[in-house]
Amino acid sequence: MWSEVLERFERHAPVSVMARVALEQALPAGWIDEVFEASRQRQYPRELMMSSVVELMLLVSLGLRPSLHAAARKMEQLPVSLAALYDKVNRTEPAVLRALVQGSAARLAPVMAQLEGEASLAGWRLRILDGNHLPASHKRLAPLRDQRGAALPGHTLVVYDPDQALVTDIVACEDAHESERTVAQTLVAGAQAGELWLADSHFCTRTLLQGWQQAQAAFIVREHGTHPRLLEQGHWQEAGRCETGVLTEQSIGIEGEAVPWRRIQLVLDEPTRDGLTQLRLWSNLPPEVTAEQIANLYRRRWRIEGLFGRIESVLHSEIRTLGHPRAALLGFATAVLAYNVLSLLKRCIEQAHREQVPELDVSTYHLAVDVVSDYKGMLIALPPDAWSSWSEASPVRTADYLLRLARHVSPRSVATSQRGPKKPKPKGYVEAAAVRKHVSTARVLRSAKGATP
């Protein structure tokens, strides 16, 4: 009986089935509770399990419920009161969030490895590091109501693997004013040999750079205005050019490092929006990697900015009603978990249709919309037992099943909408009275229609 129902969903709602299978592979309930038990410090499970909290937050991230309160009210067997639920959410420790992101990425990585893909730099695993500050929350907490300034619930440092399109690690910071450089030392301590870290100038400090060097990892970091003091500087040598400008290179040495590092200078053909005409990169990559390759690799760092935009706009990572720092950070971490699942779906659909549509770029937004449209009905029609086997399925079996489902997806329905560059509009002076004036859209349209020859 259930197989017939599942077959109909496979044909008519393949994205929702793919999402459910991927979620079961990445975040099975039993595994979440095990991670919580192993990572918690002072928090106790009590009656409400951590898996139930993550399930509720995922419903909000995927757009299946408008808020945590609405998701909790629709949950049939919530074992605690709403007050107890919010107390649990407000006490979720950052160490638990990090363990969930690390573990779920590790569970999805073998499935991603079954799919086609090329490494950005042969022999190296890319890691893009950047920070994301959560916006000001509503002042619902009593101590915040008398504060005139914005209430910032915290920030996170995120590590992104662009080759596998997975967020592999995060560090959640409850103090919104805590230095990113200080927090980054936690991530650098976990760096491994064979990794190549990309970071902006904010992370150009001797402690971080030497940390990567000692871990036998490589780095490409943009030079900061107050960079570590240089003990040695070689002569500048021509290094060709890349797509955006002319390259030169020199060797540099700092205190405590016997082997010199590399300093790449890029003189841009056109200035940036901020008026910059050149930028400099530091790297400890071997000479076999050319300056052009280093410059092109650093340009990939901007992919994490697009990641933050998609997590915010598509997966509701910034829930302003959650004012407690730990609750807001839980919302962001859950959105990251959902993003990794959608990244797997995106890669599967693109590979399944590569022969027919080689340039297909699947939109994360349209994927999320597709999931929302059919997911609720699928959960009603099929019992939880229909999915439990996927939590222990092999990566090969999971990838094959997802690719089979992906062939039922219409590429046109999930493709990214292409648009041309925006045309700049002149911003002249306008009287304040004209700005405040209201107009009737219907009258303006009628007037414009009458003026058209």
Residue ranges and their predicted role:
Residues 63-76:
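Short, charged amphipathic recognition helices of the HTH superfamily
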Residues 143:
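Conserved mixed alpha/beta core segments that line enzyme active sites in large multi-domain catalysts
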Residues 108-117:
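A short, well-structured juxtamembrane/interface segment
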Residues 1-64, 79-92, 100, 104, ...:
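Single, function-defining residue in the core of a domain
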